[in-house]
Swiss-Prot record:
This is Large ribosomal subunit protein uL29. It comes from Coxiella burnetii (strain RSA 493 / Nine Mile phase I). The keyword Ribosomal protein applies. GO terms for molecular function: structural constituent of ribosome. Keywords: Ribonucleoprotein, Ribosomal protein. One of its GO terms (cellular component) is cytosolic large ribosomal subunit. Belongs to the universal ribosomal protein uL29 family. NCBIfam families: L29 (TIGR00012).
Length: 65
């Protein structure tokens, strides 16, 4: 996920993206708990993408955008 692409999105789009990422993270955890072995690198990627989106949402809140 590219930060520059995320910066061009509105707050509503970022919130939608965050919700999708949280669902993806939940599904990965369920797969791991269910015995399936998902690719471990996906946990790190999704966690960092969530952090990026939350950071940009905070920036937009502070700038009243």
């Amino acid at each position: 996920m590219n930060v520059n692409d995320l910066r061009n999105k509105t707050k509503a789009e970022l919130k939608k993206e965050l919700l999708e990422l949280l669902k993806e993270q939940f599904n990965l955890r369920m797969q791991k708990g269910g015995g399936e072995a998902p690719r471990p690198h996906l946990f790190k990627r999704v966690r960092r993408d969530i952090a990026r989106v939350k950071t940009l949402l905070g920036e937009k809140e502070r700038n009243n955008e």
